[in-house]
Regions:
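Acidic, mature catalytic/reactive cores of soluble proteins
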Residues: 1-159
Length: 159
């Protein structure tokens, strides 16, 4: 734990942060607006869990968006990515991100789990169901009906 590879201490890992946002949203649905916590810690500001979840999601999304100077945190100090029009809008979904400045670090070929950012963007800015809600909804859908025999004895598909 103290030495060697420190990848599991400090960087921003999207799967864990995504799960945190999701569970905070779920707890907010249960506890409502009356249950608040101090956020950020030491600020004296009380927010309900939905507000905390939204803030965390926005911070994750901001890693990919351009700031007031047109720079993206995910590109860090790589000037080619920050300034070249051929590269600036080609986002990097790396394995994990620097905990202080949001720069993409880790393997660039392990992008699958960073793709959860698409769901957070959709939920924060698209006003649509989360993927979990969609899966729950379609999981509870009635089973398709079996074909009914026709007068000629052949099965006919019921829409």
């Amino acid at each position: 734990m103290f030495g060697g590879n420190s990848n599991w201490r400090g960087p921003v890992w999207f799967p864990l942060n995504y799960l945190m946002v999701t569970v905070l949203e779920r707890y907010h649905r249960f506890y409502g607006d009356e249950f608040t916590i101090e956020y950020p810690t030491g600020s004296g500001q009380q927010l309900h869990l939905g507000e905390v979840a939204a803030n965390l999601a926005d911070r994750m999304i901001s890693i990919f968006t351009s700031d007031q100077n047109g720079r993206r945190a995910c590109f860090g100090g790589t000037e080619l990515m920050q300034t070249d029009p051929a590269w600036h809008d080609n986002l990097i979904f790396s394995e994990y991100f620097h905990g202080d400045n949001g720069a993409a670090i880790g393997a660039f070929h392990q992008t699958g789990w960073t793709g959860v950012i698409a769901d957070l963007i959709r939920r924060r800015h698209g006003d649509v169901e989360s993927l979990g809600d969609v899966i729950r909804r379609i999981s509870m859908a009635p089973e398709p009906t079996a074909p009914e025999p026709t007068a000629a004895g052949q099965a006919e598909t019921v829409p």
